[in-house]
Amino acid sequence: MMSPNGSLKFASQAVAKPYFVFALILFVGQILFGLIMGLQYVVGDFLFPAIPFNVARMVHTNLLIVWLLFGFMGAAYYLVPEESDCELYSPKLAWILFWVFAAAGVLTILGYLLVPYAGLARLTGNELWPTMGREFLEQPTISKAGIVIVALGFLFNVGMTVLRGRKTAISMVLMTGLIGLALLFLFSFYNPENLTRDKFYWWWVVHLWVEGVWELIMGAILAFVLVKITGVDREVIEKWLYVIIAMALISGIIGTGHHYFWIGVPGYWLWLGSVFSALEPLPFFAMVLFAFNTINRRRRRDYPNRAVALWAMGTTVMAFLGAGVWGFMHTLAPVNYYTHGTQLTAAHGHMAFYGAYAMIVMTIISYAMPRLRGIGEAMDNRSQVLEMWGFWLMTVAMVFITLFLSAAGVLQVWLQRMPADGAAMTFMATQDQLAIFYWLREGAGVVFLIGLVAYLLSFRRGKAAA
């Protein structure tokens, strides 16, 4: 059924709006805690003991994961009805799951901030099924169980929509990615006492999310947006999508081995990890060719929302640079021996997450939000200009954050890792030498926040395009 305002093809697509709005609120929180962390690198007692560095980092990374999950869920609720050519199976269930997930997320973050972590573990019964205390998987066991319940309800809702409607390559790839995301998260409940075994399966969640099934989600969202804004034949875009997804899975699954270099597994992982992870830039490069070829050479219509085309091209370029180029720079075992755990890792992580996943969520929000607000295909020119200012401020700021962290990482390797043990500078002494880069990174982070505010204001002030 067409929505009352005529901007949405199906009324149930409107349930995507709260997911997008809450995702952006959490995104702001993530950036604020990133700025707190960045300042704590150079002013060690900033906000101590109220917000220690380890707590700020935990909140920063957890907010990243949760806001992206909200973004993916909103994207699915928006595009699956349109791809399936039918209403969402249960908008009511989508609303219930939104409030459950939002409440669980807020309570978990408040728990990090207000209760000592050991106390939080006791309070939530972690001793009954110990899963806490691992990087990125710090959530209490009860929160992890809540995520599983929300994921099952979500998959049921979108899965039933797909089953009773039209089947397309885009919806099938998206569903494959979402199901894989949920299944791989189950390994967060496996916490063996053996540290090597723990790390081996820990990466099945962390790596196979961000360098595996999340790439399927990114590819499906990008393909959907390009179909809508270019008018290119769906068959052409679907062929590109199949090639990209095949390359992502072939390189990404065995490429997990580049995380196994130094955790105590057999030596053959040095070869497997190096060879296959060296192939991981290929799907991201293919996405660049895909987006630019589709938008610039096969255009059949002048889509009025210029900002969404900018986001669609930008996400592929930044993903290729961050996940592809910066990932390749330190993925080979002989190089990773020196760079592992340095600021080069942080440089890669920042640009890769922003380019591949933050930007693809902002792409679908840029496309969908005018319709969700009842405006139509695009907002007025002033709002689009403001949004594009937000794009450039955030993107250029992230490039400089990456460059400053890369410079810090190279110097860290030179001072701390390359010299023989007796001549190597200690960790803390090395950090003092990197302070200038941390200050520069903090400044770039402030610019990033300004860009994010501009992006948000573009929707608040937007009116229909003339």
Swiss-Prot record:
Matches recorded under Pfam families: COX1
One annotated Gene Ontology cellular component of this protein: plasma membrane
Residues given in the record as Fe cation binding sites: 207, 258-259
PROSITE patterns hit by this protein: COX1, COX1_CUB
Bilayer topology: Multi-pass membrane protein
Subcellular location(s) of the protein: Cell membrane
Catalytic activity: nitrous oxide + 2 Fe(III)-[cytochrome c] + H2O = 2 nitric oxide + 2 Fe(II)-[cytochrome c] + 2 H(+)
GO MF annotation, one: nitric oxide reductase activity
Alphabetical list of SUPFAM superfamilies matching this protein: Cytochrome c oxidase subunit I-like (SSF81442)
Enzyme Commission numbers on file: 1.7.2.5
InterPro entries linked: Cyt_c_oxase-like_su1_dom, Cyt_c_oxase-like_su1_sf, Cyt_C_Oxase_1, Cyt_c_Oxase_su1_BS
Sequence intervals crossing the membrane: 19-39, 61-81, 95-115, 142-162, 169-189, 205-225, 243-263, 270-290, 308-328, 349-369, 391-411, 434-454
Statement: the UniProt record of this protein carries the keyword Magnesium: no
Sites where the protein binds heme b 2; high-spin: 348
Top-level EC class as recorded in UniProt: oxidoreductase
Pathway recorded for this protein: Nitrogen metabolism; nitrate reduction (denitrification); dinitrogen from nitrate: step 3/4
Record-listed heme b 1; low-spin binding positions: 60, 350
Keywords on record: Cell membrane, Electron transport, Heme, Iron, Membrane, Metal-binding, Oxidoreductase, Respiratory chain, Transmembrane, Transmembrane helix, Transport
GO terms classed as biological process: aerobic respiration; denitrification pathway; respiratory electron transport chain
Family: Belongs to the heme-copper respiratory oxidase family.
Quaternary structure, from the entry: Heterodimer of cytochromes b (large subunit) and c (small subunit).
Name by which UniProt lists this protein: Nitric oxide reductase subunit B
Gene: norB
